[in-house]
Swiss-Prot record:
It comes from Solanum lycopersicum (Tomato). Disulfide bonds join C94-C110, C109-C177. Coiled coil: none annotated. One of its GO terms (molecular function) is metal ion binding. Cu cation A binds at H176, H194, H203. Its cofactor is Cu(2+). This is Polyphenol oxidase D, chloroplastic. Keywords: Chloroplast, Copper, Disulfide bond, Metal-binding, Oxidoreductase, Plastid, Thioether bond, Thylakoid, Transit peptide. GO terms for biological process: pigment biosynthetic process. Its EC number is 1.10.3.1. Residues 1-83 form a transit peptide.
Amino acid sequence: MASLCSNSSTTSLKTPFTSLGSTPKPCQLFLHGKRNKAFKVSCKVTNTNGNQDETNSVDRRNVLLGLGGLYGVANAIPLAASAAPTPPPDLSSCSIARIDENQVVSYSCCAPKPDDMEKVPYYKFPSMTKLRVRQPAHEADEEYIAKYNVSVTKMRDLDKTQPLNPIGFKQQANIHCAYCNGAYRIGGKELQVHNSWLFFPFHRWYLYFYESNAGKLIDDPTFALPYWNWDHPKGMRFPAMYDREGTFLFDETRDQSHRNGTVIDLGFFGNEVETTQLQMMSNNLTLMYRQMVTNAPCPRMFFGDLMISGITLNSPGTIENIPHGPVHIWSGTVRGSTLPNGAISKRGEYGHFYSAGLDPVFFCHHSNVDRMWSEWKATGGKRTDITHKDWLNSEFFFYDENENPYRVKVRDCLDTKKMGYDYKPMRTPWRNFKPLTKASAGKVNTSSIPPVSQAFPLAKLDKAVSFSINRPTSSRTPQEKNAQEEMLTFNSIRYDNRGYIRFDVFLNVDNNVNANELDKAEFAGSYTSLPHVHRAGETNHIATVDFQLAITELLEDIGLEDEDTIAVTLVPKRGGEGISIENATISLADC
C-alpha cells in the first residue's frame, strides 16, 4: 500500500552531546493537525552545581492511591474550572530531585538542555506504512527477547561512551526522575505528572519515544515494546523475559521472593496475603473490574482530576491507583532487606519514582498501563477522552530517536494508531468478572449497627468499623442513574503521610467480613497512600484528604437499590492506628 503522507521536516538544534547521526524517519499513515504555540513561563534558575535556593520551597505532591475513587481538594473544583494548560518544563530551571526530606538524588536527572528552548519545535509524527504492534511479554519468543536485549545493551553502552546522549538508558530513566521527583518547576511549583489527569498522557508520550529509541538502535522501525499482561491470568507473574540473570533486562534490586512464578497481587501494599493462587487471581480480576468498570464510569474517575495552577492536587484516577502503584511496590524490594550483591535495599529501583525507569520492566509495566487507556474507552458508556482544552493543550518535552528535542501536546496522543502503534488483542476476562457472589445472604440488619452520626468522627481506624448510613434517594430510574452517580464519600481522612496507609471498604457486611476475599459483590474499593516525599525543614506531615467511591452498580448487584439505609464496613490493612476520619456521606454527583 502506498504511503498517504510525505516525510515531515525536522528542525535540528545543537545539544551538548555527541550525535549518533540521524536517519530518515519511517513513513506513517496518520498525521495530526497543526499545534499551537507553547505556553511560556518564567521559572527559577538553578546554578550549575545543582544547588538551589530553598526560600521558595513548596510541598511535594503526596503519592496517594485510592482504589476506585478520587479525593483531595479537586473534588470541590468543577472540571470546567479554568486551569491553564500545563506548559513544558523550562530546562534552565531544572534542579536537584529529592528522594525524601533527608535525601536528594545523588546525580542530576535533568535532560540535556538545547541551546534555545524557544526554538524547540512541536513534534510531527513520521510517516509509516506499518503499525508497530506491542505483544504480551509472556508470549515473547527467543528472537524477540534477543533483539530487545541488544537494544537495551546499546542504550547502556551510551551511558558509558556518551553519558549526555538523551537516548542512553540512564538519560531515558532520568526523564521519569525529573518529572516525578521535583526537579522541574512551573510557576514556582514542582511539576508532578502523577496524581492528576497528566498521568496517562505523560507516560504514553514517554513510552512512545523510548520505543522509537529502542528501534533506532537495532535499525528496526517496526520494533514494539512488550506489555506485562497482568490483567490476564496468564500474565499475572513477573515476565520471564526480564528475569534472566546475566542479561540487561534483569535487575537484581527487585523483590527476590516474587520471582519463580509467584502470582502477583494487584492490590499489594507491602503485606503478603495468605491465600491460594486461584483466590489471588480471582482477587486480581475483581480489582480490574472495579477499576475499569464499576469505579471508572466517566473520564473524571478514570483519568484523575484536573491540575490547577497554584493548587496541589492529590486526585489520581482508578488505574494509576491500583494496579499501577501496587505493581511498582510488588516488584521493588523491601526497604532494609539485603540484595543479592550485599547492598541494603532502599525499596529497590522499581519501588521509587526517581529510579523506577532504571529497571527495564518499567516500560513493560507501563505499556500495559497505557493499554488500559484504550481498553477503558472500548468498554463504552461515558468512557471517553477528556475534552477540557487545558488538558488537551498541556505539553511535555522529549528527545526523539535522532536526538532532536521536541515539544508535544496531550491532544496528539489520544489515538495510538495515529501515533503508529497498537496492541495485540488479548482476552480481557475482567470485563465479565463482575463479582456477584454475596458474602451476606440478605440485607444486613442496619438497626443493629451504629448510625454514621455515632461512628464518626472516628479517632483511629485500628480495627474493622461498621456503620449505617442514609442514602439521598432510593429506587432511581435508569435515566437518573445515567445522569448522576451515587457517591460514598469519606470526608477529612487524616494521617501521618510519611507511612503506608490502606483500608478497604465493603457494603452490606459487618465487621466479621473476610477482607482477603475481594471477589464478592460487597467489596467496594480501597484507600491507599504511599509515603509522602518532603523537602528538608518541612514540619507538616499530616495529610487531610477526601475519598470517593462510585456505588451505583454495587447497590444494584447487592440488591439494595430500594433501601433507604445501608451498612458500610471499613477494614484497616496498613497503618490504621494512625488514621482518623471526620465523617461519611452519600450524595448524587455529575460524573
